[in-house]
Amino acid sequence: IYIPYLGSDSNHHSNMSEKKLFLLDGHALVYRAHFAFITRPLINSKGMNTSAITGFVRTLWDIIKNEKPTHIAVAFDPKGETFRHEYFPEYKAGRDATPEDITNAFPWIHKIVEGFDIPIVSIPTYEADDAIGTLAKQAEKEGFKVYMVTPDKDYAQLVSENIFMYKPSRQGNGVDILGVPEVLEKWGIKRVDQVI
C-alpha cells in the first residue's frame, strides 16, 4: 500500500528509514464528518449536503500534508452483511438507517480517494475495522509504524509499541495519538486487550 509523492515538499522523503502506514477507517470518518456539521450543514450550489465529503477530505489532506505517510490506505465497510451476521443474526439490528446524505457522499469520497491514487480496502463480509486490524498487525511485523485513523475507541485494543490510534482533531483541538501508555491511562486499565 503505497502513496505516491504528493506536493513539492523536499522533506517528504527525508526520513525513509521510518515506514509510516496510515490506515483510515473510511466509514467512521465519514459519519464523524457528517455529524460534525449537523447543525450547520455544508450545502453546495446544487443543493447537495457536502459535509461528509468536506470533513473527510480535510482529514485526509491534513494527514498527507502534516504526517507525510510513506504508505496509506482507506478501508470501507463492504455492502451487505458481515461474517458476524452468521453467528449473531441480530448484529447491528438496532442501528438507525444510514442518513441519505451519507449514502450520497460515498461515491464522491471513493472518487476522491482514487484521485489521490490511494488504495481502497473493502473485503466482502469483513468490516473496515477487521481489515485495518489485520493490516496493522501485518505491517507491524514488516517494520512499519502504523496509525489507525479513526474516532472509534474499539481500535484501542490493537494498540502496541508500533501501532497507534490516530484520532483526527475536532473543532481545532488538535490530533490525539494514542499509544499503549495513553490507552491504559485513558481507560484506567492494565492491558490494551481489556478495551472491549
Language model features: what each stretch is:
Residues 26-27, 75-78, 150-153, 169:
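A short beta-strand-to-loop transition that corresponds to the Sensor-1 phosphate-sensing loop
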Residues 17-18, 39-43, 93-196:
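Extended two-metal-dependent nuclease catalytic cores across DNA- and RNA-processing enzymes
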